[in-house]
Design a protein with these regions (language model features):
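N-terminal Sec/ER secretory leader and immediately downstream segment
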Residues: 30-183
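Bacterial N-terminal signal peptides that target proteins for export
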Residues: 2-13
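A cross-kingdom marker for long, charged
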Residues: 28-54, 223-360
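Context-gated lysine
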Residues: 10, 26, 63, 101, ...
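Extended, low-hydrophobicity segments enriched in charged/polar residues
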Residues: 139-252
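C-terminal motif of bacterial Sec signal peptides marking the signal peptidase cleavage site
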Residues: 21-24
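Alpha-helical interaction segments
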Residues: 15, 141-142, 151, 332-339
Length: 360
């Protein structure tokens, strides 16, 4: 019996190890494609591959460095009771409860949006000369001024949204397009919320009719909970830039080894051309186009959010400004695009020098 158990355990362990190995290979397939391309080029040139340096990325700063401190402006239950005709009493009672005081950043934003709408609605329903209007008006104005900071805190310190923007450590899987679409949908929804509530002031709606208006915010929060796709996309831009720059530099440094011209043996150049088509065009170029397309879709959304929120007096640390410049304003993408162009230019020169026709 012990022998049977040990045999079964060994079989299970080996099977588990194989599964993990295969999973690891699949996760790193894009990195492996660059490594394979690099290795084959150096094999043709008969040189040692230059070690590819580590990729230095700008991390998302810690929560404590990003959180915007806000004074807690509340209406007491006594005053709130007078607002029952506006439908605000239940909302304020829930906020003042124990559970209301420990809301996550997304639910806090949802509450503030509902509360602002309720206040605005009340101000249209109460008599203009009432004491309550005089009390509520400055509260409404202060809350409206705080709204950009509340959005900022949700995006950069809220667990689910922050996870999306935290840089990963491996290249994205180009087959996981659904994760990207989920992230794009979530941040596009937030961009619309910012535009409709910060950039402009929406017309108030009766609280009983608006209850479900911001449920989609919680839906998107749930959808992105287990994903960090955008952070992986940002890392992928930086990592592929490192790869391309390293490979291009080595090709340029060894160009004298590639003979082309009349009465010359162009065999090495032809082998390089084969590597270019088989491994760069077929795999690498397609992957680079995938990254390019996804970033160009998400970047305008993130930039729109940032530009609209930056109209408010938000305190941004130098480290955060570096992160914003790199991944939201597009500096990392600019470097990625330049690295791609530099690599393609090497091949254009080689094809011209060796009189190779494109596609042959």
């Amino acid at each position: 019996m012990p022998n049977t158990f040990n045999s079964t355990l060994k079989t299970f362990t080996l099977a588990l190890g194989l599964v993990l190995l295969l999973a690891g290979c699949k996760q790193n397939s894009s990195e492996a494609a660059f490594d394979n391309y690099h290795q084959r080029l150096t094999n043709v040139l008969d040189i040692d591959p230059t070690p590819v340096p580590n990729t230095n990325v700008l991390p998302l700063p810690q929560k404590r460095d990003l959180n915007q401190a806000l004074p807690d402006i509340r209406i007491g239950l006594l005053d709130a009771y007078e607002l029952r005709q506006c439908g605000l009493f239940q909302l304020i009672a829930e906020r003042n409860s124990i559970l209301g005081k420990v809301q996550d950043k997304t639910r806090s934003l949802q509450y503030e949006l509902l509360f602002l709408n309720g206040l605005s609605y009340c101000l249209t329903q109460l008599k203009p000369d009432s004491d309550l209007v005089a009390e509520l008006t400055p509260i409404y104005q202060q809350k409206q001024q705080q709204l950009p900071m509340i959005f900022w805190n949700m995006i950069f310190t809220g667990e689910e949204w922050r996870k999306q923007l935290t840089l990963g450590h491996e290249l994205v899987d180009s087959e996981k397009n659904s994760e990207f679409l989920t992230s794009l949908s979530a941040f596009s929804y937030v961009a619309d919320l910012v535009n409709n509530n910060v950039t402009t002031t929406p017309a108030p709606i009766a609280p009983t009719l608006i209850e479900k208006k911001y449920q989609d915010l919680l839906h998107h929060q749930q959808q992105i909970y287990n994903s960090r796709y955008l952070g992986d996309l940002f890392y992928s831009l930086a990592r592929t830039t490192t790869w391309l720059n390293a490979i291009t530099a080595q090709l340029n440094a060894n160009q004298d080894l590639i003979l082309c011209g009349n009465n010359m043996n162009q065999q090495k150049a032809k082998y390089l051309r084969n590597v270019f088509y088989k491994f760069y065009v077929a795999d690498i170029q397609r992957y680079l186009a995938h990254l390019d397309s996804q970033y160009q879709q998400i970047q305008p959304v993130l930039q729109q959010i940032h530009q609209q929120l930056s109209q408010a007096p938000i305190q941004v640390t130098p480290d955060m400004q570096g992160y914003i410049d790199a991944y939201i304003n597009g500096e990392a993408y600019r470097q990625f695009h330049q690295a791609t162009l530099d690599h393609v230019k090497f091949w254009q020169r080689l094809f011209k020098q060796c009189n190779f026709k494109v596609g042959q």
